[in-house]
Regions:
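Feature marks short, highly hydrophobic, charge-poor N-terminal signal-anchor/signal peptide-like helices
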Residues: 1-7
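Short hydrophobic/aromatic-rich motifs at helix boundaries and adjacent loops
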Residues: 2, 22, 100-102
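Membrane-embedded segments
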Residues: 56-136, 140
Length: 151
């Protein structure tokens, strides 16, 4: 076999191997959870309380909850794939400063929530957060806010 044909074979096999590795490790490449459970007051969000939601498959989800004042909306905050709620406290303080409510969800596998992240699981988690808010507020007062993975 000539050297250029050998080079093509090696390149194709290398590329195929890379694709196989990406397939096998896709979850590790997609989700970067911070698994530490941190109290909201310890991060500079003393107005928030920690609530535990239950997803439809039984996973326990940690969320930080600040009720809205008067007729203000509640923001359901769906974070990105890296870190946890503790890294977003400045944004949460800005959202709640004018009386808006907040429900900041830690997906499964993040921030003390049980389970491992997956696309199907995150959809269940988002539904649990919406159900929590909907049980307390009319739909017109619920605002969905997604960052990166949460969009």
């Amino acid at each position: 076999m000539t050297s250029w044909k050998w080079l093509i074979v090696v390149a194709v096999l290398g590329y195929g191997g890379l694709l196989a590795l990406m397939y096998v490790f896709q979850r590790a490449l997609m989700y970067f959870p911070d698994t530490a459970r941190v109290a909201p007051a310890a991060t500079g969000l003393p107005q928030a309380e920690e609530v535990i939601l239950t997803a439809s498959d039984g996973e326990k989800l940690i969320a930080w909850y600040v009720p809205p004042r008067a007729d203000k909306p509640i923001v359901l905050y769906f974070q990105g794939n890296g870190g946890g709620s503790n890294l977003r406290v400045d944004r949460f303080n800005r959202l709640t400063a004018e009386g808006n409510g907040l429900l900041a969800l830690s997906y499964r596998g993040y921030g003390g929530s049980t389970g491992k992240p997956s696309e199907e699981g995150l959809i269940r988690d988002a539904q649990a957060a919406y159900d929590f808010a909907r049980a307390r507020y009319p739909a017109k007062r619920i605002v969905l806010f997604g960052e990166s993975l949460g969009t």
